[in-house]
Structures are given as structure tokens and as C-alpha cells.
Amino acid sequence: MNIAKYIDHTLLKADATKQDIKKICDEAREQGFYSVCVNGANVAYAHSLLTGTDVKVAAVVGFPLGAMTTEAKVFETSDVIAKGAQEIDMVINIAALKEGNDAEIIKDIKAVVDIANGKAIVKVIIEACLLSQEEKIRACQLAKEAGAHFVKTSTGFSTGGATVEDIKLMRETVGPEIGVKGSGGIRDLKTALAMIEAGATRIGASASVSIVNDEKDNTAGY
């Protein structure tokens, strides 16, 4: 397995400088990561560094709370796509989900999917650590119904990250048709492989270089 191709090499800290963004883009190029995942303000710079490579640029939208209006998420999506984003990782309106407002959730996701249509794929972050089992299932069902290309466990900025149990549940819920991304707290090869075995088709990580080096060490001599 080439674990690098599963990885969105991620840097979403508020104090990430241009130098930091250049570092993750250089690493992504060298290691062959699937993408880099950055905040909107860093999309244009990351795109300029990765043009002509296979590495995609993913941008977060409505991040990390998901608690802005749909119109704001749509504008943000349109803006980052114009600046070079090929993937969108958006956060759902978690309160609307907890209130049972399924129509609002679908409207919110579908608006982003529609504006991204043909230009970027959309991953929907459900922030699983804040949800009950029933809410996790419903969030995944609604994301799939709204046309999302992936469901994603976590922002990495809340009370918990990805778990194998959540990945299994999410994969069982959405079936084979769309992707499942584990993100938050995946810092070593063993954890990354456990997520993939449970059904993840993408991994979000900041410790990506360490994960890939673990894989190289494990296969050395074979």
C-alpha cells in the first residue's frame, strides 16, 4: 500500500505562516501526498506552489464551527475555488442537526455542493465527537442525500478526533458510493492503517511525514 496517496497533509493552525505553508507543500510534493489541506487565506499561495504537480489543494469552509450562514459558506466556497482549491472540507451546522432540522442540513450542504459542482469535490465534516450514534448516522445520510462526495469525522479543533468505531459506522451508513475521511489525532502508521481497514478512503493528518516514514521503515529490506 502507498499510504501517501490516502493523505491530506493538513495545516490549519491560526498562526501558520507562508513559510509553514511552503514547508507542507514541499513535503507533499516530495512524499506524494494526495493533497494539502489549508485555510482559505493560504489557498492561492499553496496553489501557486503546487501547480504542475499531482498534489491537490483542499480548503476548509465554515471552519471550525460550521455555525455561519449557508450564504457565507457558499461565498467562501466560491472564493477558494477561484483561488485554486480543488477540494472543499466543509463543516455542517451541528446545532441544526441536534434540533432535528434535516431540511436545513441538506440545504446547507447542497448549496456548497452546487457551487462546487464540476470544480471541486466536497467533504462534509460531521464533528462526530459532539454527536450521538443516531446523530452520526443521520448526518452521514443527509450528507450523502445532499450530494457530498465524502463524509469526514472531525475538524481536529473540538473535543475529539477520528475513532475506528466512527469510521466503521460512517462507512456502514454511506455504503461504498462515497468516501469516508478520518481526521483528528491520526499521528502514526498503525492508527492510519486501522482507519483505512475500518473503511476510510482518505486520512487527514499533520504528522503525515512521520506516518509515511513509518511505512518505509516497515517495508525496508523486503
Curated annotation (Swiss-Prot):
- Put simply, this protein is called Deoxyribose-phosphate aldolase
Q: Which residues form the active site?
A: D89 (proton donor/acceptor), K152 (schiff-base intermediate with acetaldehyde), K181 (proton donor/acceptor)
- Pfam families on file: DeoC
Instruction: Give the molecular function GO annotations.
Output: deoxyribose-phosphate aldolase activity
Tell me which species this is from. Alkaliphilus oremlandii (strain OhILAs)
State the family named in the UniProt similarity comment for this chain.
Belongs to the DeoC/FbaB aldolase family. DeoC type 1 subfamily.
Q: What are the alphabetically sorted keywords of the record?
A: Cytoplasm, Lyase, Schiff base
Q: Which reaction does it catalyse?
A: 2-deoxy-D-ribose 5-phosphate = D-glyceraldehyde 3-phosphate + acetaldehyde
Does the keyword field hold Cytoplasm?
yes
Q: What is its EC number?
A: 4.1.2.4
Chain ranges passing through the membrane: none
User: Mind telling me which CDD domains this protein's record contains?
Assistant: DeoC
Q: Which domain of life is it from?
A: Bacteria
InterPro entries referenced in this protein's UniProt entry, alphabetically = Aldolase_TIM, DeoC, DeoC/FbaB/LacD_aldolase, DeoC_typeI
Gene name per UniProt = deoC
Function of the molecule = Catalyzes a reversible aldol reaction between acetaldehyde and D-glyceraldehyde 3-phosphate to generate 2-deoxy-D-ribose 5-phosphate.
Q: What is its main location?
A: cytoplasm
**HAMAP family with a match to the protein in the record:** DeoC_type1 (MF_00114)
* Pathway as given in its UniProt record: Carbohydrate degradation; 2-deoxy-D-ribose 1-phosphate degradation; D-glyceraldehyde 3-phosphate and acetaldehyde from 2-deoxy-alpha-D-ribose 1-phosphate: step 2/2
- Quote the subcellular location field of this record: Cytoplasm
GO biological process assignments: 2-deoxyribose 1-phosphate catabolic process; carbohydrate catabolic process; deoxyribonucleotide catabolic process
Top EC class per UniProt? lyase
Cellular component aspect of the GO annotation: cytoplasm
